[in-house]
Amino acid sequence: MNIHSRDVNETPDRSDAEQALAVLRRWAGEASETEVAQLDPAIARLLPGQELQNYPDLKRQYPDDFDANESYRATLPDLQNGPSSLIRGAKEQIQHVGISNFRLPIRFHTRDNGDLTLETSVTGTVSLDAEKKGINMSRIMRSFYKHAEKVFSFDVMEAALEDYLSDLESGDARLQMRFSFPVKVQSLRSGLSGYQYYDVALELVQMAGQRHRIVHLDYVYSSTCPCSLELSEHARQARGQLATPHSQRSVARISVQMEQDGGCLWFEDLIDHCRRAVPTETQVMVKREDEQAFAELNAANPIFVEDAARLFCEALQSDARVGDFRVVASHQESLHSHDAVSVLTQGTMFAAPSLDPQLFSTLIHRG
């Protein structure tokens, strides 16, 4: 007797479907709900007398009185701490993974005004080993909040970083705190005063067993073009023609690595270095006599973007508390439709063959 197997790709008729359903129901009658669900949760729809397990009658009111106790929490899934088999993509180490821009008020020590409470944007990241699926991001915030009531310094940042490394079982970590730092400044001649705000970031990095303390500061100043100044004077002297040199708002981002045993480098110290190097800082409160004084100050300190980088460099080199550093300057031209930029680094910390494509656009302060 010859038996011919039915082609599985052949379209079944109703009789075939009835036979298949009978077989399925006989199997399901002996199987558990878990076995049925593992095969296909939709099978429950075909079984007489059973509830639709994939369409439960869910509660729709928020349970205010529900207690997520310890035993309940132990049942919650934790995918980020799952096995390496859950990793998607290449099983490679990730140098930085964490959270950016969580904000809270933080108190800081200052050189001249005691302690200040400032709104601070915090970024915390850790390294992730190749065989680990991920990290629990909330642990970074919880670790940081343990120290949030303290008056912050690099020593407190060190303690927070230690908690990151311990809580997340990582080898490397980075903590950055970014804020706007107010300093009261005097006008040039009128005696008025107002607050100048400086974008400051503190960064603590542990990498390959080494720990680095870094301060970033944006300094905003006016730059008068030396060439334009001379051309304007030539027009006046040679032809009696009134002319004005072009000047523009300019920004330098100063990044310095602090020497471990060099003592405290205050925010105000770094600002003072910038003012001595390039004294044409933009003004806060201005009357006519201040505006005239600022014109005279710019004429006495004309500066190309190359000059700016070297003058800031000279000021930083004079401070034993400063190790490696980088100066990024941007003169946002009033003559040209492009900007003039320069980058000067000293040491290996900030040396890089590639620059962030958006680096110079971040130096445009929009308020």
Curated annotation (Swiss-Prot):
<comment type="function">
    <text>Converts GTP to 7,8-dihydroneopterin triphosphate.</text>
</comment>
<feature type="site" description="May be catalytically important">
    <location>
        <position position="225"/>
    </location>
</feature>
<dbReference type="InterPro" id="IPR003801">
    <property type="entry name" value="GTP_cyclohydrolase_FolE2/MptA"/>
</dbReference>
<keyword id="KW-0378">Hydrolase</keyword>
<dbReference type="InterPro" id="IPR022838">
    <property type="entry name" value="GTP_cyclohydrolase_FolE2"/>
</dbReference>
<dbReference type="GO" id="GO:0046654">
    <property type="term" value="P:tetrahydrofolate biosynthetic process"/>
</dbReference>
<comment type="pathway">
    <text>Cofactor biosynthesis; 7,8-dihydroneopterin triphosphate biosynthesis; 7,8-dihydroneopterin triphosphate from GTP: step 1/1.</text>
</comment>
<dbReference type="Pfam" id="PF02649">
    <property type="entry name" value="GCHY-1"/>
</dbReference>
<dbReference type="GO" id="GO:0003934">
    <property type="term" value="F:GTP cyclohydrolase I activity"/>
</dbReference>
<protein>
    <recommendedName>
        <fullName>GTP cyclohydrolase FolE2</fullName>
        <ecNumber>3.5.4.16</ecNumber>
    </recommendedName>
</protein>
<comment type="similarity">
    <text>Belongs to the GTP cyclohydrolase IV family.</text>
</comment>
